[in-house]
C-alpha cells in the first residue's frame, strides 16, 4: 500500500537543545501584493530527530508526518549539508 502525498521542506536548524526535537527555519519568498517587492518570510517548524544527529546551522530536509506531540508535525528525513 502506498503512502499519500506528504509535504517536504528544506530549512536550517535554529535550535537543537531539546531531546529528539529540532527547530527548523524555512525561508519562503513572497511578492508584496501592492508594491511587488520580494520579501523573505520565515516559518519555524518543530521536527522529530530520533538520533539527535542534526546540529545548529545544518541544512536539513523535513517531511510532514502524523502529530507526534502538541507542536511536532514534521520529522527529519536527511541532513543535506553539515554546518561548517
UniProtKB/Swiss-Prot annotation:
Subunit structure: Part of the 30S ribosomal subunit.
Family that this chain belongs to: Belongs to the universal ribosomal protein uS17 family.
Organism: Clostridium kluyveri (strain ATCC 8527 / DSM 555 / NBRC 12016 / NCIMB 10680 / K1)
Stored InterPro entries: NA-bd_OB-fold, Ribosomal_uS17, Ribosomal_uS17_bact/chlr
Gene3D superfamilies per UniProt: Nucleic acid-binding proteins (2.40.50.140)
Recorded GO MF terms: rRNA binding; structural constituent of ribosome
Superkingdom in the source lineage: Bacteria
Record has Ribonucleoprotein as a keyword: yes
Cellular component per GO, a single term: cytosolic small ribosomal subunit
UniProt record, GO biological process: translation
Keywords, comma-separated and alphabetical: Ribonucleoprotein, Ribosomal protein, RNA-binding, rRNA-binding
NAD listed as a keyword: no
Descriptive protein name: Small ribosomal subunit protein uS17
Task performed by this protein: One of the primary rRNA binding proteins, it binds specifically to the 5'-end of 16S ribosomal RNA.
Gene of this entry: rpsQ
One Pfam family recorded for the sequence: Ribosomal_S17
Amino acid at each position: 500500500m502506498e503512502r499519500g502525498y506528504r509535504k517536504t521542506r528544506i530549512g536550517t536548524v535554529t535550535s537543537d537543545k531539546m531531546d529528539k526535537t529540532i527547530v527548523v527555519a524555512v525561508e519562503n519568498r513572497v511578492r508584496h501584493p501592492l508594491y511587488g517587492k520580494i520579501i523573505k518570510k520565515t516559518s519555524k517548524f518543530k521536527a522529530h530527530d530520533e538520533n539527535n544527529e542534526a546540529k545548529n546551522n545544518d541544512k536539513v530536509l523535513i517531511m510532514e508526518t502524523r502529530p507526534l506531540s502538541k507542536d511536532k508535525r514534521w520529522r527529519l528525513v536527511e541532513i543535506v549539508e553539515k554546518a561548517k
